[in-house]
C-alpha cells in the first residue's frame, strides 16, 4: 500500500515498520521472524522474551479477527501468567459481525473453530506428556 510500500521480506519486517511509523521506539520492538505458523510463533515469542529477561504481565495480541480465539489459546498456554488484550483486525472484509454472510467468511471461521479443537488438543496432549 501507499502507507507501507515495502518491500518486506517477512511479516515481522512489515509489522516493525508499522510500529516505528506509529512512534514505537526501535529498541522496544523485539525480533521474532522464524516462525511459520501460529503456535510456533507463540513458542518463539516466549523464547525471545525469556532471552531478554522480560516478565510479560500484560500483552496486546494483534491478529486477524477470525483468528483471534486460536491465537489467544496458544499464547495463554505459553504465557500462563499474562493478561492478554486481543486486538482483532478486520482483514479480507471478514469481521465478527459479518463472517457468516459469505461462503469465504464461514469457511475461515469454521476452519478456525475446527483447528481450535484438533490442533489444540494435540498440543495439549504433548504438553501434558512433558510434565
Residue ranges and their predicted role:
Residues 96-131:
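A structured, mid-to-C-terminal "fold-capping" secondary-structure block
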Residues 1-101:
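A structural signal for short, hydrophobic/glycine-enriched beta-strand patches
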